[in-house]
């Protein structure tokens, strides 16, 4: 039998299907993948180190730039960690609004995932539809925070401001359209022969291997592991909401696709419950040493102006200690480990980004597949390089 020679090719760091500046060194035997080695770091900005030289409030805008497709989920994990360190409680209204925005963020992120994943495999129509729907959520983002992507909306102790008039009506109007849109996506993909051929049996990783690799989020649930932090380690009042956690059976790309579709429907359900439970009240904790004063106080009294200036310039001190806080971000478990030395700045902040951990499983998932199927494996992991490189 004739011997074969292993061919090594570079995929990226500038390749449309890698969803960012990711370089993959792929070893091939013909068209069969023998090994995939990811090379990262092209988007490294030193966010963890930068946080050591900024006050706790000044670090919030840095978290926007981790998974830039899900900025409010990044904000949420960070402010929860600082609040745990301080031992303060957040008003009920602020918690409900946080849940609403976190689930809208999940919808927004999953819409980008299904759009790009479908486009990678050749389904362009879904790409156009999903980005059209995402635009409606971006409008809500702009309504509440003034920004479409880097929102900087959450604060230690609550929110930067209350939701504007007309917010709940705008959200309900958008939610009413989603069930029909999800049906459209399923109609275009779920029984599409080409889609089934490219996803069923592709990127298989067993539940045991997924746990060993530390995979979280839809990629873990697609392997049949019933684990979701919102239900199993709840935060921000998630224990009050009724929702289902979907899990897969066959541990492949198609199952991960089905899991995310169901997750989007469940997010709509959670947001509706949150809107129904929204009551009047403050959106910032009554902690003058930590939280910014109301804007009307800043504009109309010298005391309010001095109060604002002091917190903005000096920050607030935290007790010595360390905490770890994780949230169920759209891509998996996003964790913040904070170490405080009692000053106004973190002594150390370590971020556990889900994409960074999930990416390491790509060799296991792609080995033995055709080179043409590698783009489907990348898409099913739903990585973003902003949080991988940090």
From Swiss-Prot:
Location of this chain's protein in the cell: Cell inner membrane
EC code(s) of this entry: 7.1.1.-
Catalytic activity: a quinone + NADH + 5 H(+)(in) = a quinol + NAD(+) + 4 H(+)(out)
Molecular-function annotations in GO: NAD binding; NADH:ubiquinone reductase (non-electrogenic) activity; quinone binding
PROSITE patterns: COMPLEX1_49K
Coarse class of the protein's main subcellular location: membrane
Task performed by this protein: NDH-1 shuttles electrons from NADH, via FMN and iron-sulfur (Fe-S) centers, to quinones in the respiratory chain. The immediate electron acceptor for the enzyme in this species is believed to be ubiquinone. Couples the redox reaction to proton translocation (for every two electrons transferred, four hydrogen ions are translocated across the cytoplasmic membrane), and thus conserves the redox energy in a proton gradient.
Subunit architecture: NDH-1 is composed of 14 different subunits. Subunits NuoB, C, D, E, F, and G constitute the peripheral sector of the complex.
Protein name: NADH-quinone oxidoreductase subunit D
The species this protein was found in: Geotalea uraniireducens (strain Rf4) (Geobacter uraniireducens)
Gene behind the chain: nuoD
């Amino acid at each position: 039998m004739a011997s074969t020679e292993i061919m090594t090719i570079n995929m990226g760091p500038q390749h449309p299907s890698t969803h960012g500046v990711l370089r993959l060194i792929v070893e091939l035997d013909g068209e069969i993948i023998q090994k995939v080695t990811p090379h990262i770091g092209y988007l490294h900005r030193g966010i963890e180190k930068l946080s050591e030289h900024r006050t706790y409030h000044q670090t919030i805008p840095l978290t926007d730039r981790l998974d830039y497709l899900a900025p409010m989920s990044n904000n949420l994990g960070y402010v929860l960690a600082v609040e745990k360190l301080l031992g303060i409680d957040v008003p009920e209204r602020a918690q409900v609004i946080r849940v609403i925005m976190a689930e809208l963020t999940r919808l927004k992120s999953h819409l980008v995932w299904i759009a790009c994943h479908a486009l990678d495999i050749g389904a362009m129509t879904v790409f156009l539809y999903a980005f059209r729907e995402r635009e409606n959520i971006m409008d809500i983002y702009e309504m509440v925070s003034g920004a479409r992507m880097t929102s900087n909306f959450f604060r230690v102790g609550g929110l930067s401001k209350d939701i504007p008039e007309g917010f709940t009506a705008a959200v309900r109007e958008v939610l009413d359209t989603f069930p029909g849109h999800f049906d459209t996506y399923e109609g275009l993909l779920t029984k599409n022969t080409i889609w089934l051929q490219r996803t069923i049996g592709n990127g298989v990783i067993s539940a045991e291997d997924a746990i060993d690799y530390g995979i979280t989020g839809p990629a873990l649930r697609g392997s049949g592991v019933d684990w979701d932090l919102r239900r199993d380690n709840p935060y921000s009042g998630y224990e009050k909401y009724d929702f289902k956690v979907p899990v897969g059976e066959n541990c492949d790309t198609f199952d991960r696709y089905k899991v995310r579709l169901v997750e989007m429907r469940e997010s709509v359900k959670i947001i509706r419950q949150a809107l129904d439970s929204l009551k009047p009240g403050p959106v910032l904790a009554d902690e003058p040493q930590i939280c910014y004063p109301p804007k009307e106080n800043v504009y109309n009294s010298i005391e309010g102006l001095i109060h604002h200036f002091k917190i903005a310039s000096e920050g607030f001190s935290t007790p010595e200690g360390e905490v770890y806080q994780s949230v169920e971000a759209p891509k998996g478990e996003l964790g913040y480990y904070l170490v405080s030395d009692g000053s106004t700045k973190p002594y150390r902040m370590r971020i556990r980004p889900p994409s960074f951990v999930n990416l390491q499983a790509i060799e296991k998932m792609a080995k033995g597949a055709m080179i043409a199927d590698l783009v489907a494996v990348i898409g099913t992991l739903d990585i973003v390089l902003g949080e991988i490189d940090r």
